[in-house]
Every structure is written in structure tokens, then in C-alpha cells.
């Protein structure tokens, strides 16, 4: 997720969470677009052990007892409903409604994912009413508000998703937060809330023993009733991996040291020739895997690496980002216009020193 003071301000945990879900990528799914949580949910409800682990079933039962036994306050009810909506005989599980059943099922599923993925949607009360046409009793769907103090609740939700991913056979969930230095563009009040978001994500990833602050700092943040009692982390080993990328900035660095163990903060050194050569090789490898119908020769990789060194020496490429852009554009020409690549390469070779 790329933090932005307007679209994805780090002071608003729901917006950060929503962007994370929208940016979600699965190692075994290569289709374009934003798959969201549906592929993970489909995998979960198809596995009885996962359903048992998350207490996915009909019936409300005693909420506190179910939470103690492993139920996730948000994911377990969502999975319980989705299992009914995704079933082959889903139409037979719908009570009397006005209008076509297929339309109801499609709308109900969309509303369910809008809610659990953090999109603007109807209230959780209206959503519970909407889903009440599905036969059986289900746990209550609680609110997911766009309130700044809710960092702990979204940390609980993210660690739950990571635990679910592990249960489904993945290694967990990796969260990459880019442009973290934009935190400094916020008002002083919003910077305080952004610190809670960073702390909640760090706590959800490594737990009480791995963070430089006490759990009590997250205890009273957001929610009502049972939401107030939710821990900042679901499970003992959720497999959540969090990375913050920040251009050095005095206040931002101080904030990182408040949220992340000092031993986990690394200063990246500038790229040297060997690093740029490795970057060229890796970008070529990723490009080839993304376009399996196009054959990339070892000669092409060697030539691209040489051209990157050439344009760097002439001052036309200065950063890893510029190098990646140059490599991808060069490979695009080679793939789409193979008859013109020679002309392009000759033009690059004749560039003057910048």
C-alpha cells in the first residue's frame, strides 16, 4: 500500500486496510485485476479443517465462548455466510424474498465483501437484515468504521486474515507500506493517530515481545462493547510480515523507532554496479514469468544489463526506479516491436553524456 495524505492517510486505519485488500496478490493466481478476499474465502470454505479452526458454522451460540475457542469476530461470521452463498445449492438456502433468487444471492455476496474488505457500503445493521433471508442462524456482523482510533481493531482483522491464509496453505500475509514518510504531511493530531496505525500493524505482526511499546497503548482504541475487548493480534503466530519503506526524515525516523524494534530498522545503501546488474536480471526474470508466451534469451538479459550500465554511466538513469522503468520499456519494445529493437538499441548507444 502506498500512503497518501488524501486517498490513503496513515491516520485512518480503515482506508489503509481497504487499500491493502485492494492491492492483495496471491502467488498462485496470475489473473489481472484486484481479486480481493474472495479467492481466499473460497479456499477456506472448501477446507473443513479451516472451517473448524475458525469456527465456521451455522448457529449463534455463546459469543464469548466461541471467541475463546477460536472464532474471529469478523472473519468467522463472514465465512459462515459466504459458505452458504457459494454453495452449489445456494438458491435452496434462501427464504421467501421479493424478486429473483439469483439477483439476491449476487447482491448479498457483493454487500458481504464490501463490508469485510472495508469499502463504503450499507450499515452493518442493514447488512445483517439483508442476509437474514439466508436460512439458519449466524453470528452478528459487527461494524467496521472509518474512525481514526480503530487501529487495534484493524490490526486484529489483518492478523486474522494472515492466520486464515496460513491455514489455507500460504506462508501468511506480507504487508508493504510505501511512502511512510508522508506521515509528516499530516496535522499534528493526525500524526498521533498515524503512530497508532503503525504500532497496531507492528504489534499484529510480531506481538508483545517484539515491539518497543506496551500493549496497553493499544488497549482503549476504538469500538464498543466486545470490540473494546478484542486483542490487537489474533492468534499466537499469524504469519504477518510488515515492512515500512521510508525516505529518511527526522520526525518519521523517530516515529519508526517508537513503533519498530531498533534492530529491525535497516538503512539501505545506494546501489552500485553489481546491484544494478542484479536488478536487471531480476526484472528480466519477472518480465519473462509474466509473459510465458514470449521467449527471452540469455543473450537478451546480458544485452539489457549492458545497456543499463551504459545509460547509467551517461547520466540518463540515476536510481533503481528509473532503471526498472528503462528495462521494462526496453523489453516491451523487444516483445511488441522486435523489428525495431535494433534501431532503439543503436539510439541508446549513441546517447550523449548527460
What are these regions (language model features)?
Residues 1-168, 313-316, 320, 326-329, ...:
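P-loop NTPase nucleotide-binding core
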Residues 55-65, 234, 295-299, 350-354:
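A short, terminal or domain-edge coil/loop segment
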Residues 114, 342-354:
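Trafficking entry modules
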Residues 114-303:
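The catalytic "switch" region of P-loop NTPases
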Residues 203-204, 222, 307-308, 347-351:
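Short amphipathic alpha-helical patches
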Residues 279-287, 300, 304-308, 319-334:
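AAA+ P-loop ATPase catalytic core
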